[in-house]
Curated annotation (Swiss-Prot):
Further information: The PHE1 locus is imprinted in gametophytes. Maternal inherited gene is repressed in female gametophyte, while the paternal inherited gene is expressed in the male gametophyte (pollen tube) and in fertilized seeds. The maternal repression is dependent on MEA, FIS2 and FIE proteins, which may modulate the methylation of the maternal locus, and repress its transcription.
Pfam families, per database record: SRF-TF
Tissue: Male gametophyte, embryo and endosperm.
Induction (UniProt): Repressed by MEA, FIS2 and FIE in seeds, and by PKL after germination.
GO cellular-component term (any): nucleus
Organism of derivation: Arabidopsis thaliana
Alphabetized CDD domains for the sequence: MADS_SRF_like
Protein name, as recorded: MADS-box transcription factor PHERES 1
Function summary: Probable transcription factor involved in the development of gametophytes and seeds.
Keywords associated with the record: DNA-binding, Nucleus, Transcription, Transcription regulation
One of the record's GO molecular function terms: DNA-binding transcription factor activity
Gene name of this polypeptide: PHE1
SMART domains: MADS
Biological-process GO terms, alphabetical: embryo development ending in seed dormancy; positive regulation of transcription by RNA polymerase II
């Protein structure tokens, strides 16, 4: 099998002449195929040291006709895609350099992405990173944060917000009728809208284990602040549980969930006397 010929000047005269004859014949054959298959105008003028007479293709008249059509175009159109060997090579080098830089950027982004997840998982110690890695990681994180912020803005523009997120699993809202008196700031709130067609619905979302988490969080805080747990504030959640609550003493409605709750009301005409009096 013949190997690929090296693209360089052939020093041997006889080999160079033989190569010229073969390549010239093959090139003229390609010209003929191009004109026949594609229906384009083409011509060639070959001048070589092996023949004192220039060789026009397909003929002298054919060359003059094609050149006359070519000269009818403006200078800008004629030179738009015209390049010499040096310009062609420079264009190829610039294109390959750009492609190489693009591949390097992609590889670097993959490395920084792996580095970011390694830091989040605790597999990489940030204090061991060098200056370039820290700078690239900073740029990468800012880029992702900007993407997240932009995504939030798009969701807000489309009418979607965090309030549309469904409640956590296992925390089912309790719905009660508005006719049941609700305690608010030590006083009673009654439905003042007599013409209301549908009852108002209140939703309670209980924060389970809220009180159970307070001692642990206080203990963790004391440990971080190096405070003696014996000297810390003693929190007793049962203090005052026997004291009477004015709004609940004569109320027949006692929720089974005795913990902090958030109240969500539908739009209605509900009047809070204590707020109106304060205003």
């Amino acid at each position: 099998m013949r190997g690929k010929m090296k693209l360089s000047f052939i020093e041997n005269d006889s080999v160079r002449k033989t190569t010229f004859t073969k390549r010239k014949k093959g090139m003229l054959k390609k010209f003929n195929e191009l004109v026949t298959l594609c229906g384009v105008d083409a011509c060639a003028v070959i001048r070589s040291p092996y023949n004192s007479i220039q060789e026009p293709w397909p003929s002298r008249e054919g060359v003059e006709e094609v050149m006359s059509k070519f000269m009818e175009f403006s200078v800008l159109d004629r030179t738009k895609k015209m390049v010499d060997q040096e310009t062609f090579l420079r264009q190829r080098i610039a294109k390959e350099t750009e492609r190489l830089q693009k591949l390097r950027d992609e590889n670097r982004n993959s490395q920084i992405r792996d580095l970011m997840f390694g830091c989040l998982k605790g597999e990489v110690d940030v204090s061991h990173l060098h200056g370039r890695d820290l700078l690239d990681l900073n740029v990468f994180l800012n880029k992702y944060l900007n993407g997240v912020i932009r995504r939030v803005e798009i969701l807000k523009e489309n009418g979607e917000s965090s309030s549309s997120v469904p409640p956590p699993i296992g925390v089912a809202p309790t719905v009660v009728d508005a006719s049941v008196p609700i305690g608010f700031d030590g006083r009673m709130i009654q439905d003042q809208n007599q013409n209301q067609q549908e009852p108002v619905q209140f939703q309670y979302q209980a924060l389970y284990d809220f009180y159970d988490q307070i001692p642990k969080k206080l203990h963790d805080f004391n440990m971080k602040m190096n405070i003696d747990p014996n000297q810390s504030m003693n929190l007793d959640l049962n203090d005052g549980e026997d004291e009477g609550i004015p709004c609940m003493d004569n109320n027949n409605y006692h929720p089974e969930i005795d913990c902090l709750a958030t109240v969500t009301t539908a739009p209605t005409d509900v009047c809070a006397p204590n707020i109106i009096n304060d205003l």
